[in-house]
């Protein structure tokens, strides 16, 4: 059984979509609710309905209303940057080699080195493997943009090892 959206859920989803703010924090929607408890209830309901996905402790992703059957995909590099809050990470492995056109194979897994977190995360059928590495051991990295959003990736020279 499919659940629809309530009037209040639809109101703040529409506000976020009008501002094209698909990645949001709790402060972005706080004005729509009387209390933090009410906000937590609505976020929980939307997570159950598949309209909101929690990326990290404070950041969420809003699946747009225009997504058919609640199926949506986002650029993996943008997703990784948002999960890591834009700092202390670099994308490596087959994903970096594919980005630099060193290999033709589309990567199954996105390898991300960071001093903060580790483990495997799966969002939108994208498998992200976080591995720990000290910041002093980071190789030469490059900042690039995709759809106006910056992300950090291993340099072309560093990506040759995953060719």
How does the language model describe each region?
Residues 2-86, 123:
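Short beta-edge/loop segments at beta->alpha junctions of small alpha/beta modules
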Residues 4-7, 41-44, 72-73, 91-95, ...:
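Short amphipathic alpha-helical surface micro-motifs
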Residues 25, 92, 153-157:
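Helix N-cap / beta->alpha transition motif
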Residues 33-36, 86-90, 158-163:
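Generic detection of long, well-ordered alpha-helical segments
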Residues 48, 88, 139-141:
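A general, composition-driven signal for non-globular sequence regions
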Residues 48-49, 77-79, 94, 129-131, ...:
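Short, intrinsically disordered/low-complexity patches at protein termini
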Residues 51-68, 88-114:
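Active-site nucleotide-donor binding segment shared across nucleotidyl transfer reactions
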Residues 98-163:
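Phosphate-handling catalytic interfaces
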